[in-house]
Regions:
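Extended, charge-enriched "interface" segments that sit outside catalytic cores
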Residues: 2-148
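Core mixed alpha/beta domains of very large multi-subunit molecular machines
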Residues: 112-117, 121-191, 196, 200
Length: 200
């Protein structure tokens, strides 16, 4: 017997897309867990195709659905399914999300300093140096990657030859300047590298 939690998930799926749920119900009318998983599989396909109507917004949303299925299977007396293939899939999503590797970005602190000086002199829409434009484009690329694949795919930003906390602040300021709207600024985990003893 499916749990109330699983039935609520199914009802949510019906509200989201009657097309997906009617197809799953036709295949697995007497198997509610399988029907829910079929819709989840269709939503994963929609995520790959960037179908905004039914796609998963994040790997965490997919993980939450998986855990509902797992708990319901366990409560229904199917621990082998709950803690076998479903658990394996949960581990994979926890490890990789919707991607296989995490990207890291790295730039010298002096490049940031020069880019900020250039921006202060010419403004964001002025005649900027190629290196400044490249720095801004990097933050825009990070934002695009996060929107498409999730924050965990690209959030680490390494500053080489960091000498002070100001160099960390520079990164956040540049990230803000790269976007016209604050909500588009990507989340960043800035990692300063102090590569000279006197800077430690």
């Amino acid at each position: 017997k499916p749990s109330d939690e699983l039935l609520n998930l199914w009802n949510h799926q019906v509200e989201m897309s009657e097309v997906l749920t009617s197809r799953a119900d036709a295949i697995s009318a007497s198997e509610p867990h399988r029907a829910v998983m079929l819709v989840m599989a269709d939503r994963l396909d929609a995520t790959v195709r960037r179908n905004a109507d039914t796609m998963y917004r994040s790997a965490d949303d997919f993980l939450a659905d998986l855990r509902i299925v797992q708990r319901s299977l366990a409560d229904a007396g199917a621990p082998r399914a709950a803690y076998g293939p479903v658990q394996t899939l949960i581990w994979q999503v926890e490890t990789f999300g919707f991607h296989m590797v995490e990207m890291e970005f790295r730039q010298h602190s002096l490049v940031h300093t020069r880019a900020l000086a250039d921006l202060r002199e010419h403004g964001r829409h002025g005649d900027l140096a190629p290196m400044t434009r490249e720095v801004l484009d990097t933050f825009r690329a990070i934002g695009s990657i996060q929107k498409r694949y999730g924050e965990k795919m690209a959030h680490r930003y390494i500053i080489s030859f960091t000498k002070s906390a100001q160099h960390v602040a520079d990164v956040y300021e540049l990230a803000q300047l790269a976007f016209a709207h604050p909500e588009d600024v990507p989340a960043l985990d800035v990692i300063p590298l102090f590569e000279q003893l006197e800077d430690l």
